[in-house]
């Protein structure tokens, strides 16, 4: 059997979707073959909101490199969309796997030392974002200087007029053209699906990332707004957990 290891749908540990749905075998005759020609790595561990805010990069990546496999290392793989071929976590198993690969492009948007060290260590042709200098987090590309300075200088940060999307696109040497967030595919929930869809459903995300506890809204405020929405005849849905 001529295995198409470079097919985007090839899993290696289980049958691919075309095999399950159409019964085709993985060989040179498969009409569902989707070729790939390289790999891209994104390192954006957290916080959850920042991971979601980084997803517009995927739109540009798919436009510039439609045949690349995209790997994303994060603490929140559940929020990654289907455009990511391999959602990975910062675990021994996944780090071991990453070290066996070669990447055409690697982007690290975190300044934590472990993320910076990993970008330095991996086999990546073109690196963007943050690495290490004398053992400390530092811009690994000139395009990351601006974002780096906003993190070490309050003066520079207060004078900064760039929004997050422009900053991360600048790091990759791309112009931000209004690319939007990309969310995971909808997953059906019987309790939510049973709600009266003639009324709007208002989601309240009551959690808060551990990095920014000052942004946590007081519990009483959540009660007040939930009661106000319910009184107005709207559905209220509490989202997430502690974060």
Predicted feature residues:
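Catalytic machinery of carbohydrate-active enzymes
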Residues: 1-243
């Amino acid at each position: 059997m001529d295995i198409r290891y470079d097919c985007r749908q090839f899993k290696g540990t289980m049958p691919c979707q075309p095999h399950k749905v159409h019964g085709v075998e993985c060989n040179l005759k498969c009409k569902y073959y989707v070729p790939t020609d390289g790999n891209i790595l994104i390192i954006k561990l957290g916080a959850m909101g920042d991971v979601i805010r980084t997803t517009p990069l995927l739109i540009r990546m798919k436009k510039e490199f439609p045949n690349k496999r995209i790997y994303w290392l994060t603490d929140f793989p559940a929020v990654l969309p289907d455009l990511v071929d391999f959602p990975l976590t910062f675990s021994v198993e996944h780090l071991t796997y990453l070290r066996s690969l070669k990447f055409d492009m690697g982007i690290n948007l975190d300044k934590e030392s472990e993320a910076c060290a990993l970008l330095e260590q991996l086999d990546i042709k073109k690196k963007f974002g943050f690495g290490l200098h004398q053992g400390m987090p530092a811009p690994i590309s000139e395009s990351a200087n601006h974002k780096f300075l906003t993190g070490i200088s309050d003066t520079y940060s207060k004078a900064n007029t760039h929004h997050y999307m422009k900053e991360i696109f600048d790091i990759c040497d791309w112009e931000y053209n209004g690319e939007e967030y990309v969310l995971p595919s909808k997953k059906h929930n019987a309790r939510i699906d049973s709600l009266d869809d003639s009324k709007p459903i208002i989601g309240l995300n009551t959690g808060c990332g551990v990095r920014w506890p000052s942004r946590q809204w007081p519990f009483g405020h959540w009660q007040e707004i939930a009661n106000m929405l319910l009184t107005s005849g709207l559905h209220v849905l509490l989202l997430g957990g502690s974060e």
